[in-house]
Amino acid sequence: MNHKKKRFNKKKKRQRKRAILAIRILIVITVFVGVKFIPKRENKNLQIENNGTSDSEQSNNTEKTENKEEIETPKLDNSGYTSFEEDPNADDAAVVAANTKGLLNRTKTYPVRTDGKKVVYLTFDDGPSPTNTPGVLDVLDKYNVKATFFVVGTSIAANDQAKALLKKEVARGHAIGNHTYSHNYSYLYPNRVMNVNNIVSDLQKNENAMKEVLGKDFTTRVIRLPGGYWSWDGRTAMKEAMEQDGYYNVDWNALDKDAEGPKKNADQLVQCTKESVEALGPNADSVVLLMHDTYGKEETVKALPRIIEYLQSQGYEFRTIK
């Protein structure tokens, strides 16, 4: 009986030892696994810290990089002159030039626009002048209307006020066209024939004059030849030169006659404008109106509010040419 009891106790001790050994092995395995797991977690956390703690933070970092690139993009040195593509008030000079040319030489008839709108382009030649350009700009501001100024180099070079006015035209959202530097008919059109070399040289000289005021990156592809393109012989050679240099000449198909015949008062200029526009017919949907803001055109400034109101009453909206 004692012998059986001893064998039972020995067996129980062996089981206890095995259980203790199993527990120890389990503890060792647990510790080992924990040691292997913790560094991985730490490495993962370290990697996250290095790369960004979350997808949202990575997204923010990407946005910051993109914003930094946008900020670092150099701005054009052109006094803020916007391109045709960026200007909501501008129409394509290529289209306006083609439509006006077609209407003048009768290869096109109204309507010429494809959007159903009636549009008038107010254009002012020969400035800027300290006497009349400020008044024109003030009237345009009052009616929230944008215009296209065809400037002359000699007018720009005349004084610092004229230079400041050119900058003001740009700052107020108007379009700038090249009307040559000299505006000298005998130099540009000797014997009433276009001298292409002289014209191109004069246009380039005027663009350089504008760059000196507005900045080296300023450029305009819109030109208007003094007296109009169709007034002179030699147009074929000039057409080729314009195409080569990327110029678009935009003449006019309506005018207030402030540079024709005897000097007119404001009432007469308004009446001339009405007659000129009405002569285009009821379907006219693209009107390029010629006026001047140079010296001696005080009556044009006085007439301008009524001219704008008349055009508004006829359903026209005002756009620029770029």
Where do the language-model regions lie?
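N-terminal pre-catalytic segment of deacetylase/amide-hydrolase enzymes
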Residues: N2-F8, I20-L122, S129-G135, K142, ...
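Compositionally biased, intrinsically disordered low-complexity segments enriched
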Residues: K17, E49, N60, T180-Y181, ...
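Generic hydrophobic/packing signal
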Residues: R24, K36, D87, Y121, ...
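Active-site beta->alpha N-cap acidic-glycine motif
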Residues: E86-M194, Q204-R221
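Catalytic domains of cell-wall/extracellular-matrix polysaccharide-remodeling enzymes
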Residues: Q161, H183-L290, T294-L311, Y316-E317, ...
